[in-house]
A protein has these predicted regions:
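Rhodanese-like catalytic fold shared by cysteine-dependent sulfurtransferases
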Residues: 1-31, 38-71, 80-116
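Short, surface-exposed ligand- or partner-binding patches at beta-edge/loop junctions that are enriched
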Residues: 75
Length: 116
């Protein structure tokens, strides 16, 4: 996996961001976790086909359901909540975890495929 950049948010300097176009071309190789609310997941911005909804507030209780062997990309609306999720996973022993830069806003701006 090529890194796009370190997170631009100084509070998450240990988090690597991946560009939506890079993610779109590798969705079969990735575990995509959407940390938005259920209404956002099916709302106007839709969600990435094949992604799994696991809200940010559920993450602490359900992190152990994710495999540390998988490459995980966290997704949200703009990239802020997913950066929090990525940071939390890193703090809890996950190594191959990333944040989708720009969230679903940028995904939609690029015109990439969504489901609602």
């Amino acid at each position: 996996m090529e890194f796009t950049s370190k997170s631009e948010n100084p509070h998450f300097s240990e988090v690597w961001d991946l560009d939506p176009k890079e993610i779109q071309s590798k969705t079969a190789e990735l575990t995509l976790i959407d940390v938005r609310r259920p209404d956002e997941f099916v709302g106007e911005l839709g969600h990435i086909p094949g992604s799994t909804l696991l809200t940010l507030d559920q993450l602490p209780a359900k992190l152990d359901t994710l495999s540390k062997d998988d490459t995980i990309v966290f997704v949200c609306r703009s990239g802020a909540r997913s950066a929090q999720a990525t940071s939390f996973a890193l703090e809890n022993g996950f190594n191959d975890v990333y944040n989708m830069r720009g969230g679903m806003l940028l995904w939609n701006e690029y015109g990439l495929k969504i489901e609602k």
